[in-house]
Amino acid sequence: MDLAFSTEENIAAIASAVAPGQGAIAIVKVSGASAKEVVKNVVRTPSNKIWSSHKILYGHVIDKSTKKNIDEVLILIMDGPRSFTGEDVVEIHCHGGLIVVQQVLDAILKQPKTRRAFPGEFSQRAVLNGRLDITQAEAINDLIHARSQKAAQLAIAGIDGDITNKINYLREKLLDQLSEIEARIDFEEDLPKLNSKKLLTDLMLIRAELKQLINDAKQGSLIRNGLKVALVGLPNVGKSSILNLLSKHERAIVTDLPGTTRDLLESEIILEGVPITLIDTAGIRETNNEIEKIGVSLSQKTLFTADIVVLIFDLSKGWNKNDQNLLEKIPKGTPTLIIGNKADLKSQSTNIQPHATMTAITGEGEKELIQELLKLAGANELEGIEVALNQRQLDLVKVAVNALDQIEKVAAESLAWDFWTIDLREAIYKLGELTGEEVTEALLDRIFSRFCIGK
């Protein structure tokens, strides 16, 4: 899909979440050079008030073919450039529910030079018209999809321009260093010699700040994307009870019968600002039951996709060879917690030291389990993070750091200044691409195609 720079037509979309038959208010948004004329053609207002910017009008959306009212609406007008997109924008606030909202949108789309917006096209136009930079637009998308308060706070920081300001600050420093080097290349005899050691030290300080952004991005990803945590163990060790305990509601059926859970059950929780998807797996064992076999197979596959595995065993039976076999099936390198459950029934000695013990049916040990889980996830390092790069931004910063690494090698080999400028330009270009200083059509396509329609 090639949507970059396609701004000649008006675009329209439903700009609010709509569920069938639900919702008090919905919004249909129109943006473009003739957005006001488009909306005027489909509404009727009781007065002849001028359609002036940042005013709200009352009226009805009309079905032109029947002359009947489609809905009673409020109309919000925002003239460009004082609008989200920088173009004329009109919002029609109508009643919620799927049918009436779609009728309003259909009436708009029947107008000349008006089409349905592509995903992210409103935000794209805001960037093209200088209302936002790319990092701010991406932060808006992050805010819409935020799964915790911490994720929302990081997104707001991005919208406020914190990422752009930080990157621009470092990029300007690199530009200053590049200008010093190029001045010496062009006017070597007229300017004092550069101190290569001091210059390299300054560049390495910039590299250190970029590396800190990389480290913060890893933690930011934890806040933004969360973790997938698999609860695994032999049948009837209490996996479902632990899922219900952490979820604070009955998500899974709990019985004394082994093999009750035969499918993967998921529940999302927020712990210390980290979104965690808990996956209750079927007890892994040899079985002749075909349905249970499918559940066991799914459980084994989950071991390879989970960010963290919580291996639960029954303290009343102790750690046995089947528990050990299951532990050995967990892929090497996957962070794993070993939790002993049914501490109230403990009667067997165990030759393994669990990270925590608990009694899921009473809630005893829940706090310790959560602490161990957060420690393993690295959540204790989340405090103090002010900005967090997304994957696109992170990849570009990594390239910039690699370019500065090359400069360090160039300096060690005492190569000419021209060699310094090659990698310095690369770092500057990549940081410019991050903020949109260096923008391409393909870049815009890639970024905004991930947005929701109507934003």
Curated annotation (Swiss-Prot):
<keyword id="KW-0342">GTP-binding</keyword>
<keyword id="KW-0547">Nucleotide-binding</keyword>
<dbReference type="GO" id="GO:0005829">
    <property type="term" value="C:cytosol"/>
</dbReference>
<feature type="binding site">
    <location>
        <begin position="341"/>
        <end position="344"/>
    </location>
    <ligand>
        <name>GTP</name>
    </ligand>
</feature>
<feature type="binding site">
    <location>
        <position position="255"/>
    </location>
    <ligand>
        <name>K(+)</name>
    </ligand>
</feature>
<comment type="function">
    <text>Exhibits a very high intrinsic GTPase hydrolysis rate. Involved in the addition of a carboxymethylaminomethyl (cmnm) group at the wobble position (U34) of certain tRNAs, forming tRNA-cmnm(5)s(2)U34.</text>
</comment>
<feature type="binding site">
    <location>
        <position position="236"/>
    </location>
    <ligand>
        <name>K(+)</name>
    </ligand>
</feature>
<feature type="binding site">
    <location>
        <position position="91"/>
    </location>
    <ligand>
        <name>(6S)-5-formyl-5,6,7,8-tetrahydrofolate</name>
    </ligand>
</feature>
<keyword id="KW-0963">Cytoplasm</keyword>
<comment type="subunit">
    <text>Homodimer. Heterotetramer of two MnmE and two MnmG subunits.</text>
</comment>
<keyword id="KW-0819">tRNA processing</keyword>
<dbReference type="InterPro" id="IPR025867">
    <property type="entry name" value="MnmE_helical"/>
</dbReference>
<dbReference type="GO" id="GO:0005525">
    <property type="term" value="F:GTP binding"/>
</dbReference>
<dbReference type="InterPro" id="IPR018948">
    <property type="entry name" value="GTP-bd_TrmE_N"/>
</dbReference>
<feature type="binding site">
    <location>
        <position position="260"/>
    </location>
    <ligand>
        <name>K(+)</name>
    </ligand>
</feature>
<dbReference type="InterPro" id="IPR031168">
    <property type="entry name" value="G_TrmE"/>
</dbReference>
<dbReference type="Pfam" id="PF10396">
    <property type="entry name" value="TrmE_N"/>
</dbReference>
<dbReference type="InterPro" id="IPR027368">
    <property type="entry name" value="MnmE_dom2"/>
</dbReference>
<feature type="binding site">
    <location>
        <position position="29"/>
    </location>
    <ligand>
        <name>(6S)-5-formyl-5,6,7,8-tetrahydrofolate</name>
    </ligand>
</feature>
<keyword id="KW-0630">Potassium</keyword>
<dbReference type="InterPro" id="IPR004520">
    <property type="entry name" value="GTPase_MnmE"/>
</dbReference>
<feature type="binding site">
    <location>
        <begin position="236"/>
        <end position="241"/>
    </location>
    <ligand>
        <name>GTP</name>
    </ligand>
</feature>
<keyword id="KW-0378">Hydrolase</keyword>
<dbReference type="Pfam" id="PF01926">
    <property type="entry name" value="MMR_HSR1"/>
</dbReference>
<keyword id="KW-0460">Magnesium</keyword>
<feature type="binding site">
    <location>
        <position position="240"/>
    </location>
    <ligand>
        <name>Mg(2+)</name>
    </ligand>
</feature>
<keyword id="KW-0479">Metal-binding</keyword>
<feature type="binding site">
    <location>
        <position position="131"/>
    </location>
    <ligand>
        <name>(6S)-5-formyl-5,6,7,8-tetrahydrofolate</name>
    </ligand>
</feature>
<dbReference type="InterPro" id="IPR005225">
    <property type="entry name" value="Small_GTP-bd"/>
</dbReference>
<protein>
    <recommendedName>
        <fullName>tRNA modification GTPase MnmE</fullName>
        <ecNumber>3.6.-.-</ecNumber>
    </recommendedName>
</protein>
<dbReference type="GO" id="GO:0030488">
    <property type="term" value="P:tRNA methylation"/>
</dbReference>
<dbReference type="InterPro" id="IPR027417">
    <property type="entry name" value="P-loop_NTPase"/>
</dbReference>
<feature type="binding site">
    <location>
        <begin position="280"/>
        <end position="283"/>
    </location>
    <ligand>
        <name>GTP</name>
    </ligand>
</feature>
<dbReference type="InterPro" id="IPR006073">
    <property type="entry name" value="GTP-bd"/>
</dbReference>
<dbReference type="Pfam" id="PF12631">
    <property type="entry name" value="MnmE_helical"/>
</dbReference>
<feature type="domain" description="TrmE-type G">
    <location>
        <begin position="226"/>
        <end position="378"/>
    </location>
</feature>
<dbReference type="GO" id="GO:0002098">
    <property type="term" value="P:tRNA wobble uridine modification"/>
</dbReference>
<feature type="binding site">
    <location>
        <begin position="255"/>
        <end position="261"/>
    </location>
    <ligand>
        <name>GTP</name>
    </ligand>
</feature>
<feature type="binding site">
    <location>
        <position position="257"/>
    </location>
    <ligand>
        <name>K(+)</name>
    </ligand>
</feature>
<dbReference type="GO" id="GO:0003924">
    <property type="term" value="F:GTPase activity"/>
</dbReference>
<comment type="similarity">
    <text>Belongs to the TRAFAC class TrmE-Era-EngA-EngB-Septin-like GTPase superfamily. TrmE GTPase family.</text>
</comment>
<feature type="binding site">
    <location>
        <position position="261"/>
    </location>
    <ligand>
        <name>Mg(2+)</name>
    </ligand>
</feature>
